[in-house]
């Protein structure tokens, strides 16, 4: 419900505990849950203050409890609080591309105001059951290892696991680039509770690789929304919803395919846990909020395919103390359709993208979804790589010569497969000097089938390293010999 400026009700702060404010309103003028409140005024130094809060609880005696979206420094009891009469609204549409926003939808990149009148509330219902697109279709990423072994579902949710320095950011940027080129889609990146330095690095790398076009900002392919580690828990808890709301506009109004990146979904849960404790709720298992599954479901259910378009979400998942049974990652796993695991071992060999072909999984890799040819090819690739992994200890101790003829052949093919799973990226052209390659699924399956059949046994394994399709490997072999 929208309320005109004249009829906005106002209250007074009665208590401040860190980022939590209690506000008293006149009888009959109480704001609704999730309404945005604005505290305005001057602090003791005479500086203007403007803090936006979100109503979380109605306490009785005409009092509400709200959580601040920015620092509460300088606020005092008795300050006037205005009720906006509606939830937080953020700008949406093409004007958001190439820009950086905070949780309130305010631009923080010093490039001036956002040129759009379109705004949407961050609290919205998930698409109705009748609007959902129930077709199971593959979202082709153009990245061989992903499309073959752990394919993404259109409108699905993918968990991205990987430590520092194994190529998460480059993989994310390549996916943003590929969805723009191959699907005519756009991307939204939600930085939830991660380091400010990482957010800054990502922005700079996106400008360098052309994902954000500085000279013509409207040509950019991504909108960035940041609520970093130093923000109050209210901002970190809501920044994911701000990013999701921007993505929903592209799906529902522009009818596009959208990629939504959330880095890191664990920090969303962590912020919810902090807010829950500040509001005095009884903690649940391992100290998490009792509403953990509800909050996670509220976010994840809005990420889906409709008959108009799709939001495919890639979520970085931090696993505390590597404990997969911790309630935060365990609740996240229930929603995931695929996992992409990045391996430090592959990165140390120089094989990029360093996606682990044996640890990465997908519910889409079923013969009745992807077809028998794709399924069989993927299974054969995995079997060959698994056998190579089992033989590695023997090779390390006794050497290749002690293996049987059959095993030596498997090792040779597995090493070719391992190298053929690498691929030059468009966004890494600046560093590698090799032009990026988008490889279609048909070319990927054909290439791996030929390696497995033994038709390419006479080609050197180096010919398969950092190439796109098989034709490039064959021509590279000709230059090597």
UniProtKB/Swiss-Prot annotation:
CDD domains the UniProt entry points to: ATP-synt_F1_beta_C, ATP-synt_F1_beta_N, F1-ATPase_beta_CD
Membrane topology recorded in Swiss-Prot or TrEMBL: Peripheral membrane protein
Catalytic reaction list: ATP + H2O + 4 H(+)(in) = ADP + phosphate + 5 H(+)(out)
Highest taxon listed in the record's lineage: Eukaryota
InterPro entries on file: AAA+_ATPase (IPR003593), ATP-synt_VA_C (IPR055190), ATP_synth_F1_bsu (IPR005722), ATPase_a/bsu_AS (IPR020003), ATPase_alpha/beta_chains (IPR050053), ATPase_F1/V1/A1_a/bsu_N (IPR004100), ATPase_F1/V1/A1_a/bsu_N_sf (IPR036121), ATPase_F1/V1/A1_a/bsu_nucl-bd (IPR000194)
Amino acids binding ATP: 162-169
Principal cellular location given in the protein's record: plastid
GO molecular function (one): ATP hydrolysis activity
Keywords: ATP synthesis, ATP-binding, CF(1), Chloroplast, Hydrogen ion transport, Ion transport, Membrane, Nucleotide-binding, Plastid, Thylakoid, Translocase, Transport
Top EC group: translocase
Localization terms from the record: Plastid, Chloroplast thylakoid membrane
Coiled coil: none
GO cellular component: chloroplast thylakoid membrane; mitochondrion; proton-transporting ATP synthase complex
EC annotation from Swiss-Prot or TrEMBL: 7.1.2.2
GO biological process, one term: proton motive force-driven mitochondrial ATP synthesis
Key word Nucleotide-binding present: yes
Keyword NADP (UniProt): no
PANTHER family listed in its UniProt record: ATP SYNTHASE, ATP SYNTHASE SUBUNIT BETA, MITOCHONDRIAL
Family the entry assigns: Belongs to the ATPase alpha/beta chains family.
Subunit structure: F-type ATPases have 2 components, CF(1) - the catalytic core - and CF(0) - the membrane proton channel. CF(1) has five subunits: alpha(3), beta(3), gamma(1), delta(1), epsilon(1). CF(0) has four main subunits: a(1), b(1), b'(1) and c(9-12).
Role of this protein: Produces ATP from ADP in the presence of a proton gradient across the membrane. The catalytic sites are hosted primarily by the beta subunits.
Name of the protein described by the UniProt record: ATP synthase subunit beta, chloroplastic
Name of the gene this protein is made from: atpB
């Amino acid at each position: 419900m929208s309320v005109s400026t004249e009829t906005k009700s106002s209250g007074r702060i009665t208590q401040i505990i860190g980022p939590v404010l209690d506000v008293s309103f006149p009888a009959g003028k109480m704001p609704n849950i999730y309404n945005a409140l604005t505290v305005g005024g001057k602090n003791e130094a005479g500086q203007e203050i403007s803090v936006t809060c979100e109503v979380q609880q109605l306490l009785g005696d005409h009092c509400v409890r709200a959580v601040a979206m920015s620092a509460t420094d300088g606020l005092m009891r008795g300050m006037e609080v205005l009720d906006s009469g509606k939830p937080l609204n953020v700008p949406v549409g093409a004007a958001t591309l190439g820009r950086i926003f905070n949780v309130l939808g305010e631009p923080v990149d010093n490039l001036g105001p956002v040129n759009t009148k379109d705004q949407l509330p961050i609290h919205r219902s998930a698409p109705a059951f009748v609007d959902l697109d129930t077709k199971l279709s593959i979202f082709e990423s153009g990245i061989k290892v992903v499309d073959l072994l752990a394919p993404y579902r259109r409108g699905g949710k993918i968990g991205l696991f990987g430590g520092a320095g194994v190529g998460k950011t480059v993989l994310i940027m390549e996916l943003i680039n590929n969805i723009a080129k191959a699907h005519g889609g756009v991307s939204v990146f939600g930085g939830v509770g991660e380091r400010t330095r990482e957010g800054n690095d990502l922005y700079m790398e996106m400008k360098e690789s052309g994902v954000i076009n500085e000279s013509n900002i409207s040509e950019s392919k991504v909108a960035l929304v940041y609520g970093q580690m130093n923000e109050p828990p209210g901002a970190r808890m809501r920044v994911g919803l701000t990013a999701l709301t921007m993505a929903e506009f592209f799906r529902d109004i522009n009818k596009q395919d959208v990629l939504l990146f959330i880095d890191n979904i664990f920090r969303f849960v962590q912020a919810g846990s902090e807010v829950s404790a500040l509001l005095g709720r009884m903690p649940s298992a391992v100290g998490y909020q009792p509403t953990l599954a509800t909050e996670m479901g509220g976010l994840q259910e809005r990420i889906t395919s409709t008959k108009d378009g799709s939001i495919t979400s890639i979520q970085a998942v931090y696993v505390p103390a590597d404990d997969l049974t911790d309630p935060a990652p365990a609740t996240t796993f229930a929603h995931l359709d695929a996992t992409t695991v990045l391996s430090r071992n592959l990165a140390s060999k120089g094989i990029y993208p360093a996606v682990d072909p044996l640890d990465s999984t997908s519910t889409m890799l079923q013969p009745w979804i992807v077809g028998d040819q794709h399924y069989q090819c993927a299974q054969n690739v995995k079997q060959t790589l698994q056998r190579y992994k089992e033989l590695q200890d023997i090779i390390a101790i006794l050497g290749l010569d002690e293996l049987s003829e059959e095993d030596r052949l498997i090792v040779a093919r597995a090493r070719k497969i391992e190298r053929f799973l690498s691929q030059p990226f468009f966004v890494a052209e600046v560093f590698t000097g090799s032009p990026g390659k988008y490889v279609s699924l048909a070319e990927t399956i054909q290439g791996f089938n030929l390696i497995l059949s033994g038709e390419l046994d006479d080609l050197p394994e180096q010919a398969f390293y950092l190439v796109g399709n098989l034709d490039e490997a064959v021509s590279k072999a000709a230059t090597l010999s």
